[in-house]
Amino acid sequence: MGAYWNRIERAPSEFDPGDLDWQVDAAQRAGKQIVLCVGPLKTFGYPEFFVPAHHLEKPLREGILVQPATHQALLAAALAFVTWIVERYKGRAAIVAWQVEHEAVDPLGVEHSWRLSAGWVKQEVDAVRKADPTRPVVMNGFLPTSTPVRLQQWWSTRDQGDSLSVAQQLADVVGIDYYPRHALLSLGSTTLYLQGEHVRGNQRRRKELFSWAHGAGKRLVVTEGQAEPWEAVTVPPNPPGRSMYSCPPEQMIENYNRCIGWARDANSSLDAYIFWGAEYWIARQRSGDSRYLDAVARILSESSYS
């Protein structure tokens, strides 16, 4: 669940958390556990950037590393928002952890090349821990599964490491975003996909991560397990009678089983596996295709983790 800064602070120092209150209330009534992403700059959900316009006089310059010394006013506002959110919701028993940023130090998709510095993110983590020292801090990062993505991610974050590396340094719980198959581009009726789940050469980073967690006694979760299509458009297509190649229903089960197998092979465990794409399952069901919801129900009924 996300605390979207520009939706809550619509005017300077004027906070309206009504929508988030409603979501937390609903989850709590249903007996669910919540990882609340406090942002503040980056939160999941397109466009993954939710800074209020009144805190950003001009767009962040492309290619820069956003640092405390260069954006002091923005950082002060961000820390104030984070503290306000944690103070407001730390009394909610349903909240089990706070997530700081979303893929914190990686570039913002393909749209923007600026990045947050590790020092910036550390100040946000410190603010969360100061406001609530009782709950763990989660930080997530994208796990590359194809050679082109792995090389691009390494190149763009080579100065301070990617979000998984920074999460290992700063977080209590490291979250893995796992999307093994996604579209690269589409021309007419033809789509080019990157598919790397079975390529041995791309497994080293994952093995290192699980080995590190086991040796250091650290906690791992899958914060985003691909459970909806990732096509060459923003909104996943919903074609009647067909499944998109990037994630048909059976792929959800394969993704889950693969991640559980990784943990088992490393003599480790995953604290949680979060399926990413529930809105899509409901959209498919409303279109007469219940296979996505059926796949989730099968996993929940058969898995020892459920």
Segments from the language model and where they lie:
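Conserved, mostly hydrophobic/aromatic
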Residues: A27, I85, W98, V128, ...
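Alpha-helix N-cap and loop-to-helix initiation/capping positions
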Residues: A11-D19, A69-A77, H112-W120, W155, ...
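Substrate-binding cleft of secreted/luminal carbohydrate-active enzymes
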Residues: G217-S306
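Hydrophobic faces of well-ordered beta-strands that scaffold small-molecule active sites
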Residues: M1, I34-V38, V96-V100, V137-M139, ...
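Active-site beta-loop-alpha junctions enriched in small/polar residues
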Residues: G2-Y4, G39-T43, V100-E103, F142-P148, ...
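Active-site groove signature of glycoside hydrolases
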Residues: L41-Y46, G63-W114, L270-F275
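Aromatic-lined substrate-binding rim segments of carbohydrate-active enzymes
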Residues: M1-L60, V110-N140, G188-G215
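Glycoside hydrolase catalytic-domain groove-lining segments
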Residues: R115-G119, Q123-D126, K130-G141, T145-V235
